[in-house]
A protein has these predicted regions:
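Residue-level "contact hotspot" at macromolecular interaction interfaces
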Residues: 20-21, 65, 155
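Loop/turn positions that initiate beta-strands
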Residues: 24, 66-69, 159
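A generic structural signal for residues embedded in beta-strands
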Residues: 29, 71-74, 164
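Short, Lys/Arg- and Gly-enriched loop/turn segments at beta-strand edges
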Residues: 34-45, 79-89, 170-173
Length: 173
């Protein structure tokens, strides 16, 4: 089964499912980048982004028969990045807020490498978040929590297995 990136949400827990699966199964899930695509040019101002629509998650997918107390195991078999990636900094944000100026860079990606400011480096693609419906009504996909959601860890890459604790029936992965 293939689920395309056009079928995405910005909150876990409240959306109509796009598919139903029975575990164990194998899926191909296309994902959006964290900005859902609008960052396409160097120097693009942050002000052009709608920050209520960042960190989209493809789905949700009902896992039939999964009940509270179960653990879903999601194994990432492959990640195939796009041909470019975007980096964006915002003034006053991050670990060095007084030193950071707003900027946007577009990095070409080819043959397992990306190029940033003329330097080619190995690419280590990762998935920002994989989550399940939370016990509360909903959680924005950009919020880290027990449900998985936005993990932002380089450990969530090809070959990794993510275990998610089910807290609601048919947990909307």
């Amino acid at each position: 089964m293939r689920i395309t990136r056009e079928r995405h949400v910005y909150s876990l827990g409240v959306s109509e499912p796009v598919a139903t699966v029975t575990a164990p199964c194998s899926l191909t899930v296309e994902t959006c980048d964290c900005f859902n695509g609008p960052v396409t040019e160097a120097g693009q101002p942050k002000a052009r982004l709608n920050f209520s629509h960042v960190n989209p998650a493809t789905g949700p997918i009902v896992v039939e028969g999964a009940e509270p107390g179960d653990v879903l195991r999601v194994h990432i078999r492959a990640i195939r990045p796009e041909k470019t990636g975007a980096l964006m900094t915002a003034p006053g944000a991050g670990a060095l807020p007084d030193r950071v100026k707003g900027d946007t860079r577009i990095c070409p990606i080819a043959d397992g490498h990306f190029t940033f400011m003329g330097v080619e480096r190995p690419l280590n693609p990762m998935i920002g978040g994989i989550g399940v419906a939370p016990a509360c009504e909903s959680v924005p996909c950009g919020t880290p929590g027990d449900d998985g959601a936005h993990l932002g860890t380089i450990g969530l890459r090809w070959g990794a297995t993510r275990r998610l604790r089910v807290v609601v029936p048919g947990p909307l992965l």
